[in-house]
Amino acid sequence: MLLANPDRESGLEKSQVGEIRLLFSGIEGDCHGGFNRKSDSRMLKQFKRGTEVRNARQVSILSVEELADIAGIMKIPAVKPEWVGANMVTSGIPDLSLLPPSSRLQFPSGATIVVDMENFPCRYPAEIIERNNPDQAVGFVQAAMHKRGVVGWVEREGEVRSGDTIVTWIPQQRLYAHA
């Protein structure tokens, strides 16, 4: 499933589309595209809010399996990808949210996304989930921890169509013992 939203002011929710074009600046026509962005609360330890930084969050990718897990934990029928700002929804990549940084997701056109990091949950989807599940959608942030997918940036441009097969490339890594 592929989703996009051209207007950031309209909110987090995105609409389904049949195909997208990945550009070096992100998804063509999506509000989260761009080479740079303003830093936000996720970066307060490094930068003052609003500092211009490289946009490594051009694309948000979730999995059908992890969305179902979140809904089960929250005891609601479903958590729709539209509600959580997803651009892509995959199936069959185990523990998608735990893909290591620098993993590559490559599509049949050659288009490639580099995983920047896990997309930690925030309160904004909780508001949308609550609106769609009155008095039931408590605890999204806790339920979605390590299950809200990954964010990444475009390494190679190209077309992506709904239903495309994804080849996943995982870099060799070892644990850094001094963190």
Q: In which residue ranges do the predicted regions lie?
A:
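Electropositive, beta-rich accessory/interaction domains or terminal extensions
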Residues: 1-108, 178-179
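Short, glycine-/Ser/Thr-/acidic-enriched flexible segments
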Residues: 27, 66-67, 95, 112, ...
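Glycine-rich active-site loops that engage anionic ligands at enzyme catalytic sites
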Residues: 91-94, 98-154
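Generic structural signal for buried aliphatic residues
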Residues: 105, 113, 160, 166-167
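Short, charged beta-turn/beta-strand-edge "cap" motif at the junction between a beta-strand
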Residues: 111-113, 119, 167-179
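Acidic/glycine-rich phosphate/pyrophosphate-binding loops and surrounding catalytic core
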Residues: 133, 140, 149, 165-170, ...
